[in-house]
Amino acid sequence: MRRSLWMVAIALGLIAAWSIGRVQAQGDKVTFADPNHVTFTAMPNAPKTGVTSATLWGDPNEGATGTYTKFAPGWDAGWHTHTADVWIVGIKGAYLYKDEAGEKRVGPGDFLRVPGGHKHWSGGDKKEGALFYTESSGKFDLVPAK
């Protein structure tokens, strides 16, 4: 019985390690990026004006990904959800966030995790907009809330 429990624990550990590696999809190469020296383009699966991104690793159309994202000053994403979990770290300006619990201003160095399916509003600071790093655990999407 004790040996079986150890085997189950080892199997679960291996599955967890594989899953984390798969979600991050970064392989074994070091990734370095400077937001001042990347090319920003229209963000896949998002409104075409006011938001741009630079993919650092992964593919936002296929699965897990890491990007630099910019919101124009005053940009409004409206109320929406994402299918996958999203992690955000502020770099410059402020990513504005709102949900039923209240409002947050995600500035340089601040961290925010938005679980997949969680209804929220987001936008850019009215004067500076926002530059932030985003990781998504799956294909990136922006689903307008009903």
Q: What do these predicted ranges mean?
A:
Residues A16-W18, V23-T65, K146:
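A short, N-terminal "cap"/entry segment at the start of jelly-roll beta-barrel domains
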Residues A72-W75, H82-E100:
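Glycine- and acidic-residue-biased ligand/ion/polar-headgroup-sensing regions
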Residues V8-A17:
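Bacterial N-terminal signal peptides
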Residues A77-W79, L96-K98, K119-K126:
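Short beta-strand His + acidic residue motifs that chelate non-heme Fe in jelly-roll/DSBH
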